[in-house]
């Protein structure tokens, strides 16, 4: 079977069936989904009834079972990102979720409400920016992985050969994946970030591409998904590949990021920065070893760059990480701790060169992947930098962009684009493209995990820290605080539902969505607001004497402050927590 999926499709809808027609040249296949039995079969175009309602679609994302029954999810709009070795790369920009059922009369009021909530969750994930696909190219693998494949691999369908870590609709495609004959309708979709640019240096034109692939294992939002799970999957794991294509030669440099691979948590509790807690009873070495065993198999040597603070609440995590690496004693793993905030305080971001100089020799050893126009591999990447901070976002983004630039400098010199002694930083036009692309990558990764754009992107875009950048960081930090405390439970539930970590069972006697709230959840905020309002009123409407006014103000002021601290003490009861999957049971 050729490793392609159908590019042009039409969806024909009748009350009994969905017909997905392949419209590529010479294609006669029609995928038929029975809306009653949910059976999936392959047929031909003559079986499409003329009475069907028809519209174009650009791919099948998959199917999901909710309270009302099954739903078909299709891509209705797409945007061309660019061409990748003559393969077109698309971004899915709009979707439609179609019910198999014609009516909802079989549902109770509670079931209707639950189904509406589950639909809202699905639509929330679909509204997240960053879903990419190609009908002819496997986006889930790096150039180096694709260069080292068998003829049998080349004949597999895109779905079969895809790296399952990065297929975000893998759960949605489970019914189609069970039937190889319909795999040309099964479109693997990547979540992350892709940008492509045609660039010129010294009159030599080359394509520069940046791809970030988010893992769907242990996926979620900032404070609810930290550390690793029992399989060794790290939270917020992202593989970032930088690619150069010049005169038929291809080069790539791969980096990874992922949460500190221990069992730890940092649950939101209304405090600006919740205290990270390391699990005291878990077998950390088991999960830690699983994580790095798989990383070494996939990528080779591991150079860990740990950017967390080496004092305060982050210090125990840094010490535990260093201890685990030392205890494991694996020669394939190197550990470097760099206190980013301490080294770069007072906007001394030039001090990042200390870290770059420290790892320069290691980076030369790891090398990069390079293949000539004839397909001969001239160089392979022997390992990766695995960078992390607490969120694996802001500090990590800055370091990754600097390491990638150093690799790109070496690649472009070897390819003959840069002259000997020429610096990439001196190429103003390309530098602007490079910095903006890495800042856009940072924003995409941050929005997907933390809910806002990245911090510190003014440095990534301009090469220096600015006062405006600090103000924007403050604004984004406030938005993060609100989302992390008051909307991330819903976001986490949405991701768990989409990825199949939770399966809807309409026969469940108790809906996980209906969580009774304690009386204090309503009473305490009302008391605090009333007390604060009375305090203001007493200030504005003075009593007969200043002592009387002071007494009233003190009484209501103490009442409002006291209530505030009671709410803060019980912070975990007031945040928006996930309801579908209780992750603390496996943390």
Curated annotation (Swiss-Prot):
Residues 452-587 are annotated as: Essential for phosphatidylinositol-4-phosphate phosphatase activity. It is found in: Endoplasmic reticulum membrane; Golgi apparatus membrane. It catalyses: a 1,2-diacyl-sn-glycero-3-phospho-(1D-myo-inositol-3-phosphate) + H2O = a 1,2-diacyl-sn-glycero-3-phospho-(1D-myo-inositol) + phosphate; a 1,2-diacyl-sn-glycero-3-phospho-(1D-myo-inositol 4-phosphate) + H2O = a 1,2-diacyl-sn-glycero-3-phospho-(1D-myo-inositol) + phosphate. One of its GO terms (biological process) is exocytic insertion of neurotransmitter receptor to postsynaptic membrane. The chain crosses the membrane at residues 521-541, 549-569. Residues 1-520, 570-587 are cytoplasmic. Its main location: endoplasmic reticulum. Residues 542-548 are lumenal. Its EC number is 3.1.3.64. It is a multi-pass membrane protein. GO terms for molecular function: phosphatase activity; phosphatidylinositol-3-phosphate phosphatase activity; phosphatidylinositol-4-phosphate phosphatase activity. InterPro entries: SAC_dom. Phosphoinositide phosphatase which catalyzes the hydrolysis of phosphatidylinositol 4-phosphate (PtdIns(4)P), phosphatidylinositol 3-phosphate (PtdIns(3)P) and has low activity towards phosphatidylinositol-3,5-bisphosphate (PtdIns(3,5)P2). Shows a very robust PtdIns(4)P phosphatase activity when it binds PtdIns(4)P in a 'cis' configuration in the cellular environment, with much less activity seen when it binds PtdIns(4)P in 'trans' configuration. PtdIns(4)P phosphatase activity (when it binds PtdIns(4)P in 'trans' configuration) is enhanced in the presence of PLEKHA3. This is Phosphatidylinositol-3-phosphatase SAC1. The gene is SACM1L.
